[in-house]
């Protein structure tokens, strides 16, 4: 006995597209998340702005004032007559001269007494002492002060300090050369004052830095030598 079966076709057309694979969907989500994380990481490692660098400073206020007093005299020297001309047309040179002299003095004092001590741990001053055996004769003595060698010196503070310390007198020398070419001898006198003040600070802080390093080196050698001798003479040392 034989039986024949006829396949019954459904009225609803079959979906030719296969069902979505959950593994593929999860894989795409992981890929997108990885790309997003990589973009975020790349964005966070971008170039730092001046604000970001100032935030890393140990003394941001002192660093800002140092940069201001170092750069303000140069800016006022170039554009000072323009701004003064907007206020008054009389005695522009005298006002320009007085403002620059005040900025030179403020920069010299701030660098010598505040910025050097806070940013790089260095300070200097000059003393006048009477010479022994000679009445009425005096000698100038340079006194250098350095911070504790264990004190942390911020690299950003140190880099900005030394760059502006040496860059400013170079800029004033360029301006002095231009004044000679233009026969501006009154401004040349002003620039000579700026060069003398800036070079004095540059030379003094350079000597102070070398003195501090040499003193720390000698102290380190002496402490090691005395420690070695004491350990050898100590009978209880292992």
From Swiss-Prot:
Glycans are attached at residues 24, 42, 126, 129. Keywords: Glycoprotein, Golgi apparatus, Membrane, Transmembrane, Transmembrane helix. It is a multi-pass membrane protein. Residues 30-46 have a biased composition (Low complexity). One of its GO terms (cellular component) is Golgi membrane. The keyword Transmembrane helix applies. Golgi membrane protein involved in vesicular trafficking. Belongs to the TVP23 family. This is Golgi apparatus membrane protein TVP23. The gene is TVP23.
